[in-house]
């Protein structure tokens, strides 16, 4: 029978000093036999997805204590990728994921906590906490702050739904008046919550449902709705139950590594492909698998992407639907239900609130389940009032969207495409693979051949795009922006948004060893591995080279001979210490970022630390 971890610091004569300190935090005699549960919050006033989380920790804590546990809250950092975008701040975004994972490990292990409730929301916070959960392998439940309501603006008498990306695109479109741009800017992000499309934050929060580590609705109930409060309350009660099952009943099936098995990773990736999730999810799933000790690789992602159809299209792929519309259509359980009917989901994987995923789908899929309470839950609607206050409204849609032929969520027979929303491409320019969000690519350019326009920084590429130096048929190559080369693997949202605003969204491609925002659409291919700074062939591309892209056949090819490529590689290696570095880029790299770059792996490994370097130093 496992012993409560917290007994290390709460029991025995030698722990009198530790108990004195625990007492100073408010613990009483009767608390020292109870599980100590870490409430891992991420409140910050810098990020709209987190501004409303200040009171959420105590909301969960009260439920934990009412159920017989002791709750202790701490906060992690949280970076807003949208605010950090387009300047040196973006260098810090991806490294913050690993810093969050480390900080959770430090706090939980230093204080011997028995379990965790992770209150996450935005881009790097959910994956950072997921990595920590797998690393620590103690009972955990995730509950997110929830998605933002979609913005609404009236242009030329027509009400248009919009989001952050619309503001970025219109800002670079000089045909848009300043007055119209001001309206869009003020309306795009109306409430607290994670940005309203299927961007990285919402994608990751949806995936926690498929992993079995969060409750139904975690990814889709808007932050402003009163129903989300119940998710926090249930999480507080359920984590105490999981603690008792593990520590008092020796039930190891409730541990994260028992839940997030290879089959669970396959389920999560299947959902990701079906819902057209952000390409960043690939990075984070691979990183989480490494922490979980699960052999899940780009090859698995490639296999899944070939067999799973795209069942859901949400902004930025379309302006018709946002996350609030996915919820109305049955949420993630609705998508999983369609995947289940298509035989594409493993029903037997356990989760934190039901016997297994199959039981959860049977209970929560609105197509097969006619329970009034379930249907009412998925009718939770946006309030339509700008606010930073959580649970501030209880509006409901009049009816659900259960049209699986023409609705937001489709069945397999009526899929948006029988090809999934993500694809892995391989070729001589990316031997270890690269990623494209096919759900955001017009099918007319799934096969594309163009001339390389080579840039060694995102800034240089943006300058060329806005300077009208990029023309139809170009392939914009942005290199030395990978995990090592950036460092930090910047998101390329501005270049893709500006290509779209210049009318080149369907006329050009973009290839990078960096990554893309979940808000990116168009023929945007990222995560080229190995990256340029790690000796990848993307570092050998020359201006004017022909690049061939073939999504249906999962191929990307630099059209030069093997001999020519070998000569270029030899010439690069001959540069010695100057090899595999950007030639003309001025960028100040702090010691903190240098430390990250020193051990970062390429994107095909999740951009995690190369632990072999640590092992070699033992």
Curated annotation (Swiss-Prot):
Binds 1 [2Fe-2S] cluster per subunit. This cluster acts as a Lewis acid cofactor. GO terms for cellular component: cytosol. The active site is at residue 517. GO terms for biological process: isoleucine biosynthetic process; L-valine biosynthetic process. Mg(2+) binds at residues 81, 123-124, 491. It is an enzyme of class 4 (lyase). The modification N6-carboxylysine is found at residue 124. Gene3D superfamilies: IlvD/EDD C-terminal domain-like (3.50.30.80). Pathway: Amino-acid biosynthesis; L-isoleucine biosynthesis; L-isoleucine from 2-oxobutanoate: step 3/4; Amino-acid biosynthesis; L-valine biosynthesis; L-valine from pyruvate: step 3/4. One of its GO terms (molecular function) is dihydroxy-acid dehydratase activity. Keywords: 2Fe-2S, Amino-acid biosynthesis, Branched-chain amino acid biosynthesis, Iron, Iron-sulfur, Lyase, Magnesium, Metal-binding. It catalyses: (2R)-2,3-dihydroxy-3-methylbutanoate = 3-methyl-2-oxobutanoate + H2O; (2R,3R)-2,3-dihydroxy-3-methylpentanoate = (S)-3-methyl-2-oxopentanoate + H2O. [2Fe-2S] cluster binds at residues 122, 195. InterPro entries: Dihydro-acid_dehy_C, DihydroxyA_deHydtase, DiOHA_6PGluconate_deHydtase_CS, ILV_EDD_C, ILV_EDD_N, IlvD/EDD_N. Its cofactor is [2Fe-2S] cluster; Mg(2+). Its EC number is 4.2.1.9. PROSITE patterns: ILVD_EDD_1 (PS00886), ILVD_EDD_2 (PS00887). Homodimer. Functions in the biosynthesis of branched-chain amino acids. Catalyzes the dehydration of (2R,3R)-2,3-dihydroxy-3-methylpentanoate (2,3-dihydroxy-3-methylvalerate) into 2-oxo-3-methylpentanoate (2-oxo-3-methylvalerate) and of (2R)-2,3-dihydroxy-3-methylbutanoate (2,3-dihydroxyisovalerate) into 2-oxo-3-methylbutanoate (2-oxoisovalerate), the penultimate precursor to L-isoleucine and L-valine, respectively. Belongs to the IlvD/Edd family. This is Dihydroxy-acid dehydratase. The lineage of its organism: Bacteria, Pseudomonadati, Pseudomonadota, Betaproteobacteria, Rhodocyclales.
